[in-house]
Swiss-Prot record:
Taxonomy of the source species: Bacteria, Bacillati, Actinomycetota, Actinomycetes, Kitasatosporales
Subcellular location(s) per record: Cell septum
Disulfide bonds: none
Cellular component terms (Gene Ontology): cell septum; divisome complex; spore wall
Protein's gene: ssgB
Protein name: Sporulation-specific cell division protein SsgB
Record note on disruption phenotype: Does not sporulate as evidenced by the white phenotype of the aerial mycelium compared to the wild-type gray. Produces long non-coiling aerial hyphae typical of developmental mutants arrested in a very early stage of aerial growth. No effect on vegetative growth or production of the pigmented antibiotics undecylprodigiosin and actinorhodin. Aerial hyphae occasionally undergo typical coiling indicating that mutation also affects later stages of the development. Aerial mycelium does not septate into spore compartments. Increased levels of actinorhodin production.
Induction info: Transcriptionally regulated by stress-response sigma factor SigH of RNA polymerase. Transcriptionally regulated by BldD.
Family that this chain belongs to: Belongs to the SsgA family.
GO BP of this protein: actinorhodin biosynthetic process; asexual sporulation resulting in formation of a cellular spore; cell division; cell septum assembly; cellular response to salt; division septum assembly; hyphal growth; positive regulation of cell division
Entry function: Involved in sporulation-specific cell division. Required for early stages of sporulation. Important in the process of growth cessation prior to sporulation-specific cell division. Recruits cell division protein FtsZ to the future septum sites and tethers the contractile ring structure (Z ring) to the cytoplasmic membrane during sporulation. Stimulates polymerization and filament length of FtsZ in vitro.
Keyword Cell cycle in record: yes
């Protein structure tokens, strides 16, 4: 049986060193896809942007800078609060988001309870994933 862990977060989109905008976001973790965290960023009334992150990347980013390429994550402070910075890069543009560190850590602890780190392979159905990929081609 698959378990889903989700949470809603209030992120900040960093526009400049003096300015940021609120970005409501949802994180979702499904034990059927144990390596990934799916993020939905609500960028407008009806608009959303979706990204998929490695759970390990977010967990490591709580404590130290990590990631290369399209996604980089690191701990920081903003207005006296612990935040996790998430830098996203794609052909469509770049964004720097700040997530509240405590809320992200709480979410990740709940994912760890669902699938302890290092045991993801026990929850990953390779045959199902290959069937899905082959069906798309």
């Amino acid at each position: 049986m698959n378990t889903t862990v989700s949470c809603e977060l209030h992120l900040r989109l960093v526009v400049s060193s003096e300015s940021s905008l609120p970005v409501p976001a949802g994180l979702r973790y499904d034990t059927a896809d144990p390596y990934a965290v799916h993020a939905t960023f609500h960028t407008g009334a009806e608009e959303t942007v979706e990204w998929v992150f490695a759970r390990d990347l977010l967990a490591e980013g709580l404590h130290r800078p990590t990631g290369t390429g399209d996604v980089r994550v690191w701990p920081s402070r903003s207005h006296g609060q612990g935040v996790v910075c998430i830098a996203l890069s794609s052909p469509e543009g770049e964004a720097l988001l700040e997530a509240p560190a405590r809320a992200l850590e709480s979410f990740l602890k709940r994912t760890d309870a669902a699938v302890p780190p290092g045991t993801e392979h026990r929850h990953f159905d390779l045959d199902q994933e290959l069937s899905h990929i082959l069906a798309e081609s």
